[in-house]
Amino acid sequence: MSNTHFHCRKLKNKLMLTLSFLAVFFGLFWLCWILFTLITKGIPALSLELFLEKTPGPGEKGGLLNAIIGSTLMITVSTLIGTPIGILAGTYLAEYGRYSQLTKVTRFLNDVLLSAPSIVIGLFIYAIYVSQVKHYSGWAGAFALAIIIIPVVVRTTDNMLNLVPNNLREAAASLGCPQWRVITMICYRSARAGILTGVLLSIARISGETAPLLFTALSNQFTSFDMNGPMANIPIVIYQFAASPFQDWNELAWAGATLITLFVLLLNIFARIFFPQKSK
């Protein structure tokens, strides 16, 4: 009887290992296929003109300069808006309101916002901002992206500060340090690697967002630093050019997709190299 049970358990173990391997292979297969397609079609489309010329008309030569400028401006502004708000909100949840009912409700609402479709956020900014000023703008796009950043940074900051040992807080408090100094000088220093990693990953997330920008920044064909009007950006250019019947536009769409992928990849590599998570 014992041998029968032993062989049965071995069979179940092999079956589960096989299913796990197939699941991993299934996921990696599609990832490798996507990367292979992106490399074979995107890398040949990269050129110096891509960074020096604005988006062209049909049948013309051009690049993505205006889209790169627009995306850079909106990502920078949204990061400057969303990061401080997210860090301060996460600090309140982890340090000041750790055991309050408000904190539990706030964490739940933050998780809801974290999983909300980005198109809903775009519609929200359109309703409260774009429809009031009667025109699309880079500011509206930056506000939408900032709302996407905030819950990511809140969750990361909250989690990282909760990992800081209470012994450090108690030791500082016993020396007479006020709570704000304990947070800034001890908790932030202990959790800074995780917090900065969360900020970088939130930037990587908004880099490819298209839906919220359709209702806020839209796009244009000009090189502009003015965020008070419609502003070109790489995700919208990819969306427009990929669906066009013109071969040169299709190539620019693949080049834009490659740029975003490389940017996200570099951010992830940077975060892992310079802000590694310490094992316990």
Curated annotation (Swiss-Prot):
Pfam family for this entry, one: BPD_transp_1
Domain ABC transmembrane type-1 span(s) in chain numbering: 68-271
Entry keywords, A to Z: Cell inner membrane, Cell membrane, Membrane, Phosphate transport, Transmembrane, Transmembrane helix, Transport
GO cellular component assignments: plasma membrane
Keyword Cell membrane attached: yes
Subcellular location: Cell inner membrane
GO-annotated molecular function: phosphate transmembrane transporter activity
InterPro entries linked: MetI-like, MetI-like_sf, Phosphate_PstA, Phosphate_transprt_permease
The organism's place on the tree of life at top rank: Bacteria
Spans through the membrane: 19-39, 68-88, 108-128, 133-153, 195-215, 251-271
Xref: SUPFAM superfamilies: MetI-like
Species, as recorded: Pasteurella multocida (strain Pm70)
Membrane-topology descriptor: Multi-pass membrane protein
Keyword Ribonucleoprotein: no
Phylogenetic classification of the source organism: Bacteria, Pseudomonadati, Pseudomonadota, Gammaproteobacteria, Pasteurellales
GO biological process: phosphate ion transmembrane transport
Gene3D superfamilies: MetI-like
Name assigned to this protein: Phosphate transport system permease protein PstA
Family: Belongs to the binding-protein-dependent transport system permease family. CysTW subfamily.
Its biological purpose: Part of a binding-protein-dependent transport system for phosphate; probably responsible for the translocation of the substrate across the membrane.
